[in-house]
Amino acid sequence: MPRLFAAALTLTLTFTLTAADWPQFRGPARDGVSKEKGLLQSWPDGGPPLAWTAKGLGGGYSTVSVSGDRIYTLGNKGSDSHVVALNRADGAVLWTAAVGPAGGSLGCTPTVDGGRVYALGQMGHLVCIDKDGKRVWQRDLHKEFGGKKGGWNYCESPLLDGDRVIVTPGGTEATMLALDKATGKEVWRCPIATRHTEAGYSSVVVATVGGIRHYVQLFNGGLVGVSTDGKVLWTFEKLGGNTANVPTPIVMGDHIFSSIGYGRGASLLHLTAENGRITVREVYYARELTNKHGGVIQVGDYVYGDTDDSGRPYCAEVKTGKVIWKRGDEGTGGGSASVTFADRRLYFHYDNGTVALVDPSPGGYREVGSFTPPRRNGSSWAHPVVCDGRLYVREGDLLYCYDVRAKQ
């Protein structure tokens, strides 16, 4: 495994951003890892200082994207889902723009490129919206491309790659789809012949193996690799047919780590390229490494994530799948935990609202601070985001912004 622990993912996605941006779900590299330094390594009692609170986001579990002087998220308001734009400085709502009909708990996160925002609604309406909240174009994944959503509708965050938008309608006609990001016109569609064809709730990532750059996605048919011109390169159906496949895969050089929930577990795959083809070998299958929807983070030689949705995070060795530790009764959070990483620390957002700062040590689960936001609205499933010295925590209609910069 000579390249397993190399720089995990080098995305050449075309974003107009600064080093202080977080323009899409799980950040610039879609791995949940921030490159920031100079952050608090522990928190005082009560947590870090609260910079501001925003309200009026609507219902749902979507997290935020941060770009320039704006923050974007999605929320259900009445019978429709909306993109919500906020001022980055104080959280003031600047505008809202309808995406399409609401359908249950909204979990998609907008993707931002310069002055345009791309968002997918629960019922399959994919929209491009300009910086003033005006719709540039819209496509319907179900009606136009034969899309087949899962039981909780769509929950994907669009991928921007160069001049294209990549999404996963599901179904047999266009299981994966590429559109021109400027016009919304179809570039290619890729039918994927697996036993289960419903869209999952994961988001597409980019992998390059042996010079072959391609898209990797976890949907209800399992894992798939699709070329940049829309051809199926490989499939791995062992993880298919689940109640819901949610966590976004982690690209680790020529390896793919993918965890799913409902007691199923995780697989590490080794990809080999030869003569323009990619072959896949399963390195291991680890039933203990389940994860429903909180995501998994790679830090060095280890991966960290919640065990299914139990509120019992684990640390496991990447190369073997061996569990090094699993949280017991220590710590403060409870229920499903989503996670991000910044400046040598894990940030867990638990279902009971608790936000915990954790030292990612293979020696055990060790919190170095925790707090609970003042108010909550139902389950706390939105992934935390750390960007430009700020920690963003979504609680339904509310967004909290905390200052996590270390004092000089």
Predicted regions and their residues:
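Noncatalytic, solvent-exposed loop/strand surfaces
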Residues: L17-Q408
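Bacterial N-terminal signal peptides
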Residues: A6-T16
